[in-house]
UniProtKB/Swiss-Prot annotation:
Function (record text): Essential for the assembly of the photosystem I (PSI) complex. May act as a chaperone-like factor to guide the assembly of the PSI subunits.
PROSITE patterns: TPR, TPR_REGION
Subcellular location: Cellular thylakoid membrane
Iron is among the record's keywords: no
Family, per entry: Belongs to the Ycf3 family.
Family matches, as PANTHER family: CELLULOSE SYNTHASE OPERON PROTEIN C (PTHR44943), TPR REPEAT-CONTAINING PROTEIN MJ0263 (PTHR44943:SF8)
Organism: Nostoc sp. (strain PCC 7120 / SAG 25.82 / UTEX 2576)
Principal subcellular localization: membrane
Record's keyword annotation contains Nucleotidyltransferase: no
Transmembrane segments: none
Gene Ontology BP term (one): photosynthesis
Protein name: Photosystem I assembly protein Ycf3
GO CC annotations, alphabetized: plasma membrane-derived thylakoid membrane
Amino acid sequence: MPRTQKNDNFVDKSFTVMADIILKILPTNKKAKEAFVYYRDGMSAQAEGEYAEALEYYEEALTLEEDTNDRGYILYNMGLIYASNGDHDKALELYHQAIELNPRLPQALNNIAVIYHYQGEKAKETGDHDGGEALFDQAADYWIRAIRMAPNNYIEAQNWLKTTGRMQIDVFF
């Protein structure tokens, strides 16, 4: 049974109805519509914590989706799942692929920075000060890129950049 028939939550039902209406009126080809259905079902499964199911839907959406920006969003969502499951290497791989396809994804840049920062903290905890600092520098690079795209977001990252001396004064102008 398609996920769209299983939604019992009002918001999910509303989203599904709206998405179905949009799919019917937008002048897109059949393949693009199918890709969107899988993407929508993947988002629904992901929101419910059904990560394995969400990944299956996203994989199918990737095989059908031709638009590079949309493929970037699919890969980004897949990265979210892997990151939440602790597979940071796979998440980084997917976030980097997402940015290659859709460079206007500050949220992917932010998530890459968060992972590098986390890895830097872990490296320092194990006594690898230089490795930790190198990872912090990588995190800073990605946060700066994200903040340049979305200057009103990532306030904590901006504060971290300032307090660690990793931010140039004019970086966000």
